[in-house]
């Protein structure tokens, strides 16, 4: 009975306080990656600075891998069409890969390329021993089924983490190549020392590549093969009435927004001291300059006055997504995920 009572006592303590951790972990993380001009404003988490640290770690990892006599990690990127944003994203990925010692190649196809030709390309890359990771830049033209193409990539080379097997393993809390944006959000939370155990989390957005994987990472068991966040997660989407969304976000300690709606989350929807992670990517016209600018889904200037942590757009989740893609490429080269 004494053993059982002690076990129950420990469980109550864990449920009440979350797992113990060394004092000052969060504070050190704030100083390393965040800034706040005034004490009553949120710490702005710099994804740019955090990504720099991860790239340094990856560079060391690549050098250690090569020192053991292994082949240099190689990333093959397939780009379809002439979408300017896609070309910019791909250039950034190639530049970042080169900086950490990962070699890459770009395969460009016109927007009228057939689905069959794309599948032939992925088949060839799957069988190529020099290729560690394969990425198909999305979106694809309407006549090409994205799910079919993503599933055409070998799971062990699927550095975007979109293959049905990788998504399935993620849902089962098993090791897999995790979608890069979801992995970026999870890494930001961990490196900033933000507690998730038993916390209320709202994920606004249910896309299969971003919102759903984020929710899976945050709600799953922290003691499983692939540890999760042990949070209580509510998923909202475009059909969630605004007042209902507001009711959920006002209760949430962590709000993650990946809906693609500028200004979706306003200050009145956020509780004091919440963590707000903005995954949104929206191009809008600046009313003052008339120029196009990049914004997220959060009213940043207003919300930062209530939150404890907030990520900016640009300079938040975006740089971290590229860093986690490179991390997946190194994992794929080592072939240790499965």
Swiss-Prot record:
User: What's the protein's topology in the membrane?
Assistant: Peripheral membrane protein
Cofactor annotation: Mg(2+)
- Name a single GO cellular component: mitochondrial inner membrane
Instruction: Provide the protein's localization.
Output: Mitochondrion inner membrane
Return the similarity comment. Belongs to the tetrahydrofolate dehydrogenase/cyclohydrolase family.
Which GO molecular-function terms appear in the entry? Answer: methenyltetrahydrofolate cyclohydrolase activity; methylenetetrahydrofolate dehydrogenase (NAD+) activity; methylenetetrahydrofolate dehydrogenase (NADP+) activity
- Which CDD domains does the record associate with it? NAD_bind_m-THF_DH_Cyclohyd
The name on file for this protein is: Bifunctional methylenetetrahydrofolate dehydrogenase/cyclohydrolase 2, mitochondrial
According to the UniProt entry, what is the EC number of this protein?
1.5.1.15, 1.5.1.5, 3.5.4.9
Q: Which domain of life is it from?
A: Eukaryota
What pathway is this protein said to act in by its record? One-carbon metabolism; tetrahydrofolate interconversion
PANTHER family hit by this protein: BIFUNCTIONAL METHYLENETETRAHYDROFOLATE DEHYDROGENASE_CYCLOHYDROLASE 2, MITOCHONDRIAL (PTHR48099:SF7), C-1-TETRAHYDROFOLATE SYNTHASE, CYTOPLASMIC-RELATED (PTHR48099)
Residues binding substrate, per UniProt = 89-93, 136-138, 314-318
Q: In which tissues is it expressed?
A: Widely expressed.
- Name the UniProt key words of this record, in alphabetical order: Amino-acid biosynthesis, Histidine biosynthesis, Hydrolase, Magnesium, Membrane, Methionine biosynthesis, Mitochondrion, Mitochondrion inner membrane, Multifunctional enzyme, NAD, One-carbon metabolism, Oxidoreductase, Purine biosynthesis
Query: Where do the annotations place NAD(+) binding?
Result: 205-207, 238
BP GO annotations: 10-formyltetrahydrofolate metabolic process; L-histidine biosynthetic process; methionine biosynthetic process; purine nucleotide biosynthetic process; tetrahydrofolate interconversion
């Amino acid at each position: 009975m004494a053993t059982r009572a002690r076990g129950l006592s420990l469980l109550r303590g864990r449920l009440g306080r979350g797992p113990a951790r060394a004092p000052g972990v969060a504070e050190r993380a704030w100083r390393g990656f965040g800034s706040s001009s005034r004490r009553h404003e949120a710490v702005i988490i710099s994804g740019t600075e955090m990504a720099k640290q991860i790239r340094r770690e990856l560079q060391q990892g690549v050098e250690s891998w090569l020192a053991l006599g292994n082949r240099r990690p190689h990333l093959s990127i397939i780009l379809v069409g002439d979408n300017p944003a896609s070309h910019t994203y791909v250039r950034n990925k190639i530049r970042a890969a080169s900086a950490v010692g990962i070699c890459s190649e770009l395969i460009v196809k016109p927007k009228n390329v057939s689905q069959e030709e794309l599948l032939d390309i992925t088949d060839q890359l799957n069988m190529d021993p020099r290729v560690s990771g394969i990425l198909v830049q999305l979106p694809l033209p309407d006549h090409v089924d994205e799910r079919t193409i993503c599933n055409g990539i070998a799971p062990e080379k699927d550095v975007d983490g979109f293959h049905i097997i990788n998504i399935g393993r993620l849902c089962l809390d098993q090791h897999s190549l995790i979608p890069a944006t979801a992995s970026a959000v999870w890494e930001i939370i961990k490196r900033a020392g933000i507690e998730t155990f038993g916390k209320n989390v709202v994920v606004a957005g249910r896309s299969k590549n971003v919102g759903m994987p984020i929710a899976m990472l945050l709600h799953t068991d922290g003691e499983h093969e692939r540890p999760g966040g042990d949070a209580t997660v509510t998923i909202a989407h475009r059909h969630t009435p605004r007042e209902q969304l507001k009711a959920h976000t006002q209760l949430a300690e962590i709000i993650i927004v990946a809906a693609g709606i500028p200004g979706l989350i306003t200050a009145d929807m956020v509780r004091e001291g919440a963590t707000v992670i903005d995954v949104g990517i929206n191009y809008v016209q600046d009313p003052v300059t008339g120029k196009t600018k990049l914004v997220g889904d959060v009213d940043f200037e207003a919300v930062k006055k209530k939150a404890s942590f907030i990520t900016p757009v640009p300079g938040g989740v975006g740089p971290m997504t590229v860093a986690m893609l490179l991390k997946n490429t190194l994992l794929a080269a080592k072939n240790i995920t499965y």
